[in-house]
């Protein structure tokens, strides 16, 4: 009898608690959340990665929400070059990268395989477009109308990126290409949040060399003041180091009312190395984040992690920075700014989809090769 009472009072409630919890993320566990991850790749450069259900287990109770995307580029495997060695990363082969549009359908279907409660923890992003192509905007619209209710933004996509840009097949993407302007104009119209990667400088610049990247990205931001843009990694790369007085430059830029739509993510362990390289670098970074607490987001930039420890290692790396932040700045960096920006984008994008989902499909005009005569 005592065992029966014990079973009813303890075991059965525990069973239902487990049954209705969301992959270990019960309602009462929100206080344990350390991070809303604004920058995460579910798949790698050969479109392989972590199963999304497994990734929910990796997130556990420590990560609340995640901006979810793949990699827009596929690394080519050229047998005549590497033989049976199948490269899985862009630094592992001399062969080109090419844009892989199916990544958006893959991310959408992974998201749609989840329950509504699980879906609420993700903000899928569109990445499978070529930013040098005037048709890129048409691809983005097509993805939204094919998968309504799924996507929140676009990115991470790259314009100038060390090693990568020169490997992409076809015309190189540039900051002054009208195709990019067309993309960002549509994001302003639809409410899509943008995650843009553009290096702040070229690799191994010579002393006194002109930094043309800075002026071009300033001009881009000025042309698109109605588009919410997250500048990934603050322009820093694996070998693209922070430029001289970068924090002072960033301070000046963020102070301008004309840049109120620009946000910075400090994702990637390579960026964390630079920020924590010296006490001075850490203090300077903390000072700017404390001054503009609404403008920074935290992401991991991990690619297809296999366990929680490797997924969240960046949080330990950034501890010296976190220790110098005010409570308000730390909360907004780690969680609050994500919720504000992505929640707003969700509402706007759903409204755009509702207004345009039944738009008539345009019939393209006949071309000389089609053999169809104009009426």
Model-assigned labels for residue ranges:
Residues 1-12:
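Bacterial N-terminal signal peptides that target proteins for export
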Residues 2-4, 27-38, 47, 51-66, ...:
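Mid-to-C-terminal alpha-helical segments outside catalytic/metal-binding sites
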Residues 10-22:
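Bacterial N-terminal signal peptides
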Residues 26-109:
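An N-terminally biased module of ancient metal coordination in phosphate/nucleic-acid-related enzymes
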Residues 28-33, 82-202:
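Active-site gating/metal-coordination segments in enzymes
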Residues 36-40, 66-69, 122-126, 153-155, ...:
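Hydrophobic faces of well-ordered beta-strands that scaffold small-molecule active sites
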Residues 41-43, 71-72, 127-131, 157-160, ...:
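Active-site beta-loop-alpha junctions enriched in small/polar residues
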Residues 161, 166-298, 367-374:
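Catalytic pocket-lining loop regions of alpha/beta-barrel enzymes
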């Amino acid at each position: 009898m005592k065992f029966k009472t014990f079973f009813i009072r303890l075991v059965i409630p525990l069973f239902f608690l487990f049954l209705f919890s969301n992959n270990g993320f019960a309602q009462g566990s929100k206080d344990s959340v350390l991070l809303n991850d604004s920058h995460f790749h579910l798949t790698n450069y050969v479109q392989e990665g972590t199963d999304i259900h497994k990734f929910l287990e990796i997130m556990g109770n420590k990560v609340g929400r995640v901006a979810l995307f793949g990699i827009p580029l596929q690394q080519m495997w050229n047998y005549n070059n590497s033989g049976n060695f199948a490269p899985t990363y862009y630094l592992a082969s001399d062969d080109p990268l090419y844009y892989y549009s199916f990544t958006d359908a893959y991310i959408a279907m992974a998201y749609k395989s989840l329950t509504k409660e699980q879906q609420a923890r993700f903000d899928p992003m569109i990445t499978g477009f070529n930013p040098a192509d005037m048709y890129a905007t048409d691809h983005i619209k097509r993805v939204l109308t094919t998968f309504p209710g799924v996507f929140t933004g676009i990115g991470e996509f790259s314009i100038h990126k060390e090693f990568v840009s020169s490997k992409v097949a076809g015309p190189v993407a540039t900051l002054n290409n009208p195709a990019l302007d067309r993309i960002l104009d549509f994001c302003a119209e639809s409410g899509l949040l943008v995650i843009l990667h553009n290096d702040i400088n070229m690799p191994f610049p010579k002393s006194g060399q002109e930094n043309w990247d800075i002026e071009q990205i300033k001009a881009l931001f000025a042309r698109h003041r109605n588009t919410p843009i997250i500048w990934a990694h603050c322009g820093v790369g694996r070998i693209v180091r922070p430029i001289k007085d970068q924090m002072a430059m960033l301070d000046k830029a963020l102070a301008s009312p004309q840049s109120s739509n620009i946000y910075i993510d400090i994702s990637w362990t390579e960026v964390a190395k630079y920020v924590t390289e010296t006490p001075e670098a850490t203090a300077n970074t903390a000072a700017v984040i404390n001054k503009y607490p609404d403008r920074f987001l935290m992401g991991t930039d991990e690619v297809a992690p296999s366990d929680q420890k490797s997924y969240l290692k960046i949080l330990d790396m950034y501890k010296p920075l976190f220790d110098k932040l005010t409570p308000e700045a730390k909360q907004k960096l780690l969680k609050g700014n994500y919720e504000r920006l992505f929640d707003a984008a969700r509402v706007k994008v759903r409204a755009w989809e509702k207004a345009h989902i039944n738009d008539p499909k345009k019939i393209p005009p006949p071309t000389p090769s089609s053999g169809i005569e104009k009426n």
